[in-house]
């Protein structure tokens, strides 16, 4: 995500009762909708000139329906069940502004997904990216946001639900927490059973679930780390979660945001390998099974965070989608574990 906070873990926890079944496993990938215009701040000179291997096979721009349909085909064929689209409020800290929201280029890919003729191959949901520049303040604005979702997204047959409730993920959940009850009430008023709310952050009450957006060792600055150290970090954190709390684990494709830094100051991970990523995914499945989690979800960071080094989409440097194919192998692994 272009606006990154040095919050090193966003952990999400689901509360379920019955044993997990392989067919319940759903794997989602976060979709960063920042590549729609030439003026996007995501296109840094450093990214374009020094990291050309990260360019997706369809080019940097993703703002036409043919490319979205191609992404749906590729993702669904390889085991991705849904995209979690980053969604941005307008106006920052101000009153709900539907006109400005609809005009945001950062919602282009979500709009294209809704129009795609092959969207029945995947589900989708919303991650509210309520960070600086897209802050939501006050009960009324949170309620209007959910009302907008109900009118424009929840009614779509492909919207992801759990227990017949639309799934909404909160990037900065503490800001939204006081208004969860009101948001649920708004969803009920719109004809739904309520929301299935997932918070990025551990230990917050009122949410139905929790998950990470991404995670890395933020204490290490300007330091090169081995790829497998990233997985060790993520798995160490989730293993500390109390047994009574059921976790929707994160699997990260990588972290290296040097293309977005004028001065390289954050940790980054090198020596990427498909085998290490596959084992990372397998351990997430094992983790879900060990905690008897139904309706199990694994979240992957990310489908297309090219600037931050977290991407599954096939690129110039991975034209055959070798990392993406590990997701399909994970589905087979889950079936064998059944």
Where are the language model's segments positioned?
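Sec/Tat signal peptide C-region and signal peptidase I cleavage site
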Residues: 18-22
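Glycan-processing catalytic domains of CAZymes
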Residues: 23-338
